[in-house]
UniProtKB/Swiss-Prot annotation:
Involved in the regulation of the intracellular balance of NAD and NADP, and is a key enzyme in the biosynthesis of NADP. Catalyzes specifically the phosphorylation on 2'-hydroxyl of the adenosine moiety of NAD to yield NADP. The lineage of its organism: Bacteria, Bacillati, Bacillota, Bacilli, Bacillales. NAD(+) binds at residues 51-52, 122-123, 149, 151, 162-167, 186. It is an enzyme of class 2 (transferase). GO terms for molecular function: ATP binding; metal ion binding; NAD binding; NAD+ kinase activity. Its EC number is 2.7.1.23. Its cofactor is a divalent metal cation. Keywords: ATP-binding, Cytoplasm, Kinase, NAD, NADP, Nucleotide-binding, Transferase. NCBIfam families: PRK03501.1, PRK04885.1. This is NAD kinase 2.
Length: 265
């Protein structure tokens, strides 16, 4: 789309990255793009770095759904969110200059912690901050599903299923399926206490509610993608699939499952 000409570069400051981005900015201007200094002015936001930098870029620019996010890897290979390589500038220019840009949409999750709202691209995690079993009543919609005892839980988007969720044996979910995945962290299962003991998937119209049992473990660590949210006396966390999505450039040779194969196999 030719009206997308304002580009904002998001990256972690370092001498090496500053020099690399200086060259990218010059190249962008040579091809008719306008480099802007605030993300609110941009309709293309380029994240320079790995997947962690991409998550930061999306969060720091407020999960905009009216622009394109572009992930550019620095280290010579692509990542799950970084479709381009910083050394392959021809591919970047060709894709962003195209009259008919194909767009890939990634869903977000809405998270509410005691009435305070957040959004995540990968996952929200809630864990004990002390060496003590964490107890939560788990509700699916209005149904009391179980009382969880263990280290915590992860609730992930389909794209986030490849991250923290996968490292604790959660399933990788096709992002074309609108859902959230709930994965336990070290659940306590014995003759006295019982949880489901496996990940489970909820459809887009379901709401998950975690009610914290106030037994001295009411100061949990809540992870919002790769950021920690610190708060005391947490009573309730609600999670659902958001109606909002972010957009990235879709490449013909870089589908989600090609990325999964490239990353893990």
């Amino acid at each position: 789309m030719t009206d997308r000409r304002n580009i904002y570069f998001f990256y972690k400051k370092s001498e090496e990255t500053d020099e690399q981005c200086k060259k990218l900015k010059q190249l962008a201007e040579e091809h008719g793009f306008r480099v802007v200094h605030h993300h609110n002015e941009a309709n293309i936001i380029a994240s320079i770095g790995g997947d962690g930098t991409f998550l930061q870029a999306v969060r720091k620019t407020n999960f905009r759904d009216d622009c394109l996010y572009v992930g550019v890897a620095k280290k010579g290979k692509a990542h799950l969110y970084a479709d381009f390589n910083i050394y392959d500038t021809d591919k970047m220019i060709e894709a962003t200059n195209s009259e008919q840009i194909e767009v890939r949409k990634y869903p977000l999750i809405d998270v509410t912690v005691d009435g305070t709202s957040f959004q995540c691209l990968n996952e929200v995690s809630i864990r004990s901050s002390i060496i003590k079993t964490f107890v939560m009543d788990v509700y699916i919609d209005d149904l009391h599903f179980e009382t969880f005892r263990g280290d915590g839980m992860i609730v992930s988007t389909p794209t986030g299923s490849t991250a923290y969720n996968k490292s604790v044996d959660g399933a990788i979910v096709d992002p074309l399926i609108p859902c959230i995945q709930v994965t336990e962290l070290a659940s306590l299962n014995n003759n006295t206490y019982r949880t489901l003991g496996s990940p489970f998937i909820l459809s887009a119209d379901r709401k998950l509610t975690l009610k914290i049992v106030q037994d001295g473990n009411d100061y949990p660590i809540i992870g919002l993608d790769n950021e920690a949210f610190s708060t005391m006396n947490v009573k309730e966390v609600e999670v659902s699939l958001s109606g909002k999505m972010i957009k990235t450039i879709k490449l013909k040779d870089n589908s989600f499952w090609e990325k999964v194969r490239r990353t893990f196999l």
